[in-house]
């Protein structure tokens, strides 16, 4: 309902609702067909990321003339769940692999807060589905531009009990996608 109200009150907001949730990758594919504007920002509905940080990404894109801005997470809570260690190990490993293969210095390749210029966004063709799509668009973004910016963003992680869907096999698929997109 909140999004419908925004769409009604602001003509530059376009909302698309699906009958069945098929994940963020599917939503991004739909967005590629309908989105317009100068900048594209991906925001998860679960609000693990603070929407106030959108301004930080946008400021870097505009002032520093960056085509792609990716966040790197700062935890909003001091509560650490046991699986965070393994998640951070996986994210750090994926980030290291991406940086080695693509010659970048990204701090957190799994951060879901990303901003693209429209020109860059329309030239990215995600080659995967589900969670792999996220890594595919990052790989293609860094292949297509060297104008990359980064900024810290606040992050409040959910647990599996809270509805977190990311499991260990996502890391394996991401690893595969980073390699496949590099050599294709």
Positions of the model-derived regions?
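A generic structural signal for alpha->beta connector loops
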Residues: 10-13, 65, 103, 145
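Residue-level signature of catalytic and energy-coupling elements of molecular machines
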Residues: 31, 46, 117, 141, ...
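Terminal low-complexity segments of carbohydrate-biosynthetic enzymes
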Residues: 2, 52, 176-184
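Acidic donor-binding segment of Leloir-type glycosyltransferases
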Residues: 1-16
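Catalytic donor-sugar/metal-binding loop of nucleotide-sugar-dependent glycosyltransferases
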Residues: 104-105, 127-129, 138-156
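Cofactor-binding loops of NAD(P)H-dependent oxidoreductases
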Residues: 18-20, 45, 151-153
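Acceptor/aglycone-binding surface of glycosyltransferases and processive sugar-polymer synthases
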Residues: 18-34, 39, 51-131, 157-175
């Amino acid at each position: 309902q909140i999004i419908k109200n925004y769409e009604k009150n602001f003509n530059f907001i376009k909302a698309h609702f699906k009958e069945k949730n098929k994940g963020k990758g599917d939503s991004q594919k739909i967005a590629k067909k309908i989105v317009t504007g100068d900048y594209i920002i991906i925001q998860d509905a679960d609000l693990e990321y603070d929407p106030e940080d959108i301004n930080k990404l946008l400021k870097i894109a505009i002032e520093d003339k960056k085509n792609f801005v990716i966040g790197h997470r700062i935890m909003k809570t001091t509560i650490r769940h046991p699986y965070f260690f393994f998640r951070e190990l996986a994210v750090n490993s994926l980030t290291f692999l991406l940086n080695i293969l693509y010659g970048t210095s990204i701090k957190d390749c799994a951060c879901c807060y990303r901003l693209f210029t429209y020109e860059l966004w329309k030239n990215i063709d995600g080659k995967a589905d589900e969670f792999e799509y996220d890594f595919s668009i990052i790989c293609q973004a860094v292949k297509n531009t060297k104008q990359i910016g980064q900024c810290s963003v606040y992050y409040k992680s959910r647990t599996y009990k809270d509805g977190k869907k990311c499991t260990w096999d996502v890391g394996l698929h991401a690893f595969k996608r980073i390699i496949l997109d590099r050599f294709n």
